[in-house]
């Protein structure tokens, strides 16, 4: 196989829309630039908005678990690829309330934002510019 970056395709799972992911170099390095090694352990799935929405609805209606759009892609891939008698897990990195407008529209509901998340969302973003040099990063960490 040959890695060929593609233009991003916008979906409601916006972090999954990257056509040329910056972290792909890490995957290549981890697997020694071997396509065979990568495909022996990694499979991929892609979903359009309607499918992502369906996974959110199915999961919520079947067990009351509310997925965010990215988790819905992981859940869908697990359901699509899991073989009979296999057990699998999927992980989510965000609370569905981070995508409240999207989830509300999918479920035709008004989901609640947990108090702790509400407080966090009211906080001020703090960023400190650093160079790409490890020594500068280390110096900053040692200073705090």
Segment roles from a protein language model:
Residues 1-144:
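PLP-dependent amino-acid enzyme catalytic core
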């Amino acid at each position: 196989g040959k890695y060929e970056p593609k233009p991003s395709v916008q979906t409601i799972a916006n972090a999954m829309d990257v056509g040329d992911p910056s972290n792909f170099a890490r995957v290549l390095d981890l697997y020694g630039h071997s396509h065979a090694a990568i495909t022996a352990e990694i499979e991929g799935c892609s979903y359009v908005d309607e499918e992502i929405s369906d996974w959110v609805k199915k999961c919520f209606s079947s067990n009351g678990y509310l997925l965010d759009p990215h988790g819905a892609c992981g859940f869908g891939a697990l359901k699509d690829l899991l073989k009979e008698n296999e057990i699998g897990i999927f992980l989510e990195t965000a609370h569905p309330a981070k995508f409240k407008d999207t989830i509300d529209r999918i479920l035709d509901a008004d989901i609640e934002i947990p108090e702790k998340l509400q407080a966090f969302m009211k906080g001020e973003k703090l960023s400190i510019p650093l160079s790409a040099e490890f020594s500068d990063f280390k110096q900053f960490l040692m200073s705090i």
